[in-house]
Amino acid sequence: MELDEIKVFGRWSTKDVVVKDPGLRNYINLTPIYVPHTAGRYTKRQFEKAKMNIVERLVNKVMRREENTGKKLKALKIVENAFEIIEKRTKQNPIQVLVDAIENAGPREDTTRISYGGIVYLQSVDCSSLRRIDVALRNIALGAYMAAHKSKKPIEEALAEEIIAAARGDMQKSYAVRKKEETERVAQSAR
């Protein structure tokens, strides 16, 4: 007897998802999982979160805002409904669209503050792959909440639109891509 393939939310396969960016390949975890909920198993050590499924990391970022703090089931439903909308609009695997959005929304360069002789100035530094993913997921979730705040648009639709726009690299529609470009522009001026 052959076992069925394990799919995220019982619908979407991670088997055909391709990570194009070689720097992010080791840090975007696409292991098949029914429900992306590991109950903090990978938070004990420094780089353990690279072992966490990328969908669960998105769910955890969605869960951070005021009204959703600690409500993981609500965040899981938001992400699942957003994935349904993405699948209807793009006719693609929503996990592949999410991976493309992370690749386009993660900044490659950032700045750090350096104090030298009492004078503080910014110095351009390269971003690590793990930080690129963290910043991209945070900005995608933040952009969705900003689009849904004080509007009739539900959060699921706002999250789906943000992920689709970030996957296309659309600066006009995606908050995450705009923030990435702004961060890289500031870093370039601080070289």
From Swiss-Prot:
The keyword Methyltransferase belongs to this UniProt entry's keyword annotation: no
InterPro entries per record: Ribosomal_uS7, Ribosomal_uS7_arc, Ribosomal_uS7_CS, Ribosomal_uS7_dom, Ribosomal_uS7_dom_sf, Ribosomal_uS7_euk/arc
PROSITE patterns linked to this entry: RIBOSOMAL_S7
Keywords (A to Z) from UniProt: Ribonucleoprotein, Ribosomal protein, RNA-binding, rRNA-binding
Superkingdom classification of source: Archaea
A Gene Ontology molecular function term of the record: rRNA binding
GO biological process: ribosomal small subunit assembly; translation
Pfam family, one: Ribosomal_S7
Function, in words: One of the primary rRNA binding proteins, it binds directly to 16S rRNA where it nucleates assembly of the head domain of the 30S subunit. Is located at the subunit interface close to the decoding center.
Family: Belongs to the universal ribosomal protein uS7 family.
Protein name as it appears in the record: Small ribosomal subunit protein uS7
Organism phylogeny: Archaea, Methanobacteriati, Methanobacteriota, Methanomada group, Methanococci
